Amino acid sequence: MRKVLFPWPTGELAEVTEDAKTDLEALRKVAEVDISQISTEKEWFERSRDVYAISSPRIPFSRYRDFLNEAKELKMIQTASIGYNHIDIAACTEKGVVVCNVGEVMAESVAQHTWALILDVSKNISRSDRVMRAGGWEIERRFAIELYGKTLGLVGIGDIGGRVALKGKTAFGMSILAYDPYVLPARAQLYGAQLADLETVLRESDVISVHTPLTPETQHMIGSKQFNLMKPTAIFVNTSRGPVVDEAALAEALENKKIFGAGIDVFEQEPVSPTSPLRKMENVVITPHTSSSTKEAFRNTYKGAINNILRFIEGKRPNWAVNREVLTAKR
């Protein structure tokens, strides 16, 4: 019987196990399921030697090839996240290991968080809250921004970006521009979006929201040059991955008021340094990478991971494969 390893934190499992009990029971009929915490790299290597599928191994990127050489039976890595930049995809592909994320199961939570940041920044909500808690009342009231009828620009229009677009169009009557070299115009139109080059999106949008995975091509794709293209009244939001944005360039743009404000949930280094300039700025709202942190997204993530591993073991094509070319090879 093939072995599946879920190294999930005990506290998280206490919340999700009851809901996922039926899914786990189905998986246990076809696989030996090991659910336990693993705390050291040595333990990861030892426990993974005879594993067929594993969820979210916490292996340093630089050690992935060594890990894969040890895990000789491994055929599937299933993340418990949308992002997969922590996994050496090239090494996995070479070894014939398919890597899957959890696709759209977190999309609604992230899209809602994106809009929470947009609205907070546009209406100075957090800023007003700080003034009130400090005993004050007066704030620069005339400097809030209405969103109705404005232009929303998306960098990436997949499951999350598409949901952000639909909310902007239906709730605020916004025009939608999107840059995504991997999406066809017909797909963008489903979300009411018009595709454009990145420069056009940045120049013409009143709100710019980033929804792209972190890859070598997207690292620092938003830097000083890109911030200089934006309107001084623009709101910039990132709920994708921190290194997609040059954080120093963002801080400089905010400090010099090249943009109106920003809402940031992801950072180049996490946790964020206590000395980060973003912690001290009034025109930025920051949250600690919590855009996907809802009970619903949490539950759906684990259910999605369990069921996708079950699909793979049963010989079905798994959902959300990142390196699809592996699936064409015989297992």
Tell me what each language-model feature is.
Residues F6, L152-L154:
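Hydrophobic Val/Ile/Leu positions in short beta-strands of Rossmann-like dinucleotide-binding domains
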Residues D23, T93, N101-Q112, E268-R331:
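C-terminal helix-to-coil terminal segments
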Residues D34, L177, P243:
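Conserved beta-strand positions in the Rossmann-like core of class I SAM-dependent methyltransferases
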Residues K95-V97, G103-T151, R163-A171, A321-V322:
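Phosphate-binding beta-alpha-beta segment of Rossmann-like dinucleotide-binding domains, i.e.
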Residues I157-G158:
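Glycine-rich Rossmann-fold phosphate-binding loop(s) that bind the pyrophosphate
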Residues M1-C100, G223:
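An N-terminal-biased, well-structured beta-alpha scaffold segment characteristic
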Residues F45-R49, L68-A71, L147, V201-S205, ...:
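A short, aliphatic-rich alpha-helical micro-motif
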